[in-house]
């Protein structure tokens, strides 16, 4: 099914790849996004959906010194977020605080809370502990996981532990398990690795080539969703990982990211380099799948795609559900176009 141009758009000044839901903002539907300009001063935009839901407003515009490759908002403080950035061939990661007061009339300077300077190689991402009130975070480069404790009042971050994934694996990203704060999934060229943060050791893995992105289902404890380089999407039951419990066709080119809805367990979003955002209906349960009749199972496999949003002219890399209004999501294409959409017409009946 092809979607129309019903989304609310906002244009960034430069190219961009990352957008994050501001989970700690309980009063507004808000998103943070950052630009990726090689020659110009980069920007972080704080965007809020108007109370009537008809406009996407820039509530804050902040200068950022480097190209932003990853951005994640703190789950416990709406003014704090992390970025991974590059300057030429070198990479860095830092925690930032939005100054008060702020506005869009001119570009304000962000306050650096802490530098995550325990890396020597290319840094890929920063993950915040999903508990919402924790000061713990993880940063990953291609070879290492670093576990941090953040003290924003003292403007410092302390390394609690650091571990190498081994020379055979090149880490590319990951997701923190919302059901078990001691567990993190890390993606690599050849597998999904599961790490126990208490011991900083791998305790399990899914051997699957070229996994690009993963996300946990917030409503189903054992379900993980992965996006693969060959364009497909797979749902895994972590209690039995030999085969996926469901496969979705993904995108016509690379599937770049997948996100499970924070409230509706059957809904999954994906974005890709085919300039599309796809909304999927997935059972997300091996028990559910095996209990279906052959006709029901066949119908679900044939048409799991609820809608395809095609308001884009470039590859779509950024994707975030709103945690405050879980029927709303934001997507970001490489040309700097942010689009807000509602999936209300596709919500499952309860």
Swiss-Prot record:
Any Pfam family? Beta-prop_EIPR1
Q: How does it assemble?
A: Interacts with ABI5 and DDB1A and DWA1.
Any Gene Ontology CC annotation: nucleus
- Name recorded for this polypeptide: WD repeat-containing protein DWA2
Where does the UniProt annotation locate this protein? Nucleus
Sorted alphabetically, the keyword list is: Abscisic acid signaling pathway, Nucleus, Repeat, Ubl conjugation pathway, WD repeat
Which BP terms does GO give this entry?
abscisic acid-activated signaling pathway; negative regulation of abscisic acid-activated signaling pathway; protein ubiquitination
Q: Where are the WD repeats?
A: 39-79, 118-158, 166-205, 206-246, 250-290, 311-350
| Pathway stated in the Swiss-Prot or TrEMBL entry | Protein modification; protein ubiquitination
Q: From which organism does this entry originate?
A: Arabidopsis thaliana (Mouse-ear cress)
Q: Which domain of life is it from?
A: Eukaryota
Q: What happens when the gene is disrupted?
A: Increased sensitivity to abscisic acid (ABA) and salt.
Q: What's this chain's function?
A: Component of the CUL4-RBX1-DDB1-DWA1/DWA2 E3 ubiquitin-protein ligase complex that acts as a negative regulator in abscisic acid (ABA) signaling. May function as the substrate recognition module within this complex leading to ABI5 degradation. Functionally redundant with DWA1.
Specify whether Nucleotide-binding is a keyword of the entry.
Answer: no
